[in-house]
Amino acid sequence: MFKSSLRLRRVLLIGLALLLPAMGAHAEDPPLVRATNAVRVLNDIMQAPDKAIPTDLLRDARAIAVIPDMIKAGFIFGGRRGEGLISVKTPDGTWSNPSFITMTGGSVGFQAGVSSTDVILVFRTQRGVDSIVNGKFTLGADASAAAGPVGRTASAATDGQLKAEIYSYSRTRGLFAGVALDGSALRIDYDANAAIYGPGITPRRIFEGGVSNVPAPVVDFRDRLEEYTQR
């Protein structure tokens, strides 16, 4: 019994040693690099019309979040971490300047390896937007999420998809075949926001247009959303 316990502890320690470097290697992308990568992900997904997010979904969306290169690593216990941006639809129908965010989550069960996943979240209701403005949002708890339809229109969406408040899109490379997002927490990255917009700037102020001298890579993210919405 003692030997079995010792063996299990050794396995868990090995797994932890493998997991932590993988999670930490991508933990602190500079904000402007993050913005550039988010634009790349958005462009890559939207440039294939038959596999893109339907433009009618983008037109009706309340917010869109892009998390490039989210890392998922696992060995018995698993974890995921990513950093990205989120913009919300303003009252006049245009897209706001983005706030910086993080996404984290965990899982238990047999798993081994590391994968990198690009994630896009399309918020269909105001409820999820209000939660993230207040600082934190959990997929599956604060709003239901489902894999979103792809193609030229959203007409092919299933009943389950139509009931979801958030559509998720992912592109995964590595050892994992997909990504499960329920239970993942989105949080405002106040440090990154301060680095770009200045100290003390709230997400609400960013979304309502109360910032100036926004760096070009951050503006480019907003402009790409405008472009793909108007197609």
List the predicted regions and their residue ranges.
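Small-residue-enriched, tightly packed secondary-structure blocks
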Residues: 28-231
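Sec/Tat signal peptide C-region and signal peptidase I cleavage site
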Residues: 23-27
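Bacterial N-terminal signal peptides
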Residues: 11-21
